[in-house]
């Protein structure tokens, strides 16, 4: 197998590969051969993705080279493969959609490689943490981290200099990593925290927080024990 550094050259197949038409991605007109991907080291760089999964990821990377919007939603990804960074190395991405996968974490490398994106969709995954390096996404305007497994709202979201919209609804968030003094932003317009089991203290703190952006909360129902006096 050739070294992985060769991966990212022309891996599209413009001529038929015998009669094996099942190895092509017909969804967007690309005819990407598994055989060619293997020759370029694709299976080494894209672990846990087999057959059509590799074709789908590579095909969407090729599309992103044209429109600067990387859509890797519903690709059964557990993480962002190194091959994706390699394929996108000469492309200035505007947005990245990683929704509806099984991703458990984003590595610090992501912020370095995709530093110019303005929209990041991480929704419908299995994430519980964000790396502090995401604060380096200096152009990010919108972050969707809804429908994940976050137990706390990461403090890094308040360090993104241009972030306007933060969607963190439908998680398991009970508290915020930052204290009240750190819940501030010159750019934020909306923080959606609906459908999270916030603690009573956190809920009241957010509801009365002296911030210049709107915080959406699901009206909290008091537990029976909260009305008890000792």
Task: State where each predicted segment sits.
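The feature captures the LRR N-terminal capping module
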Residues: 1-123, 129-132, 176-230
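A generic tandem-repeat structural signature
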Residues: 106-173
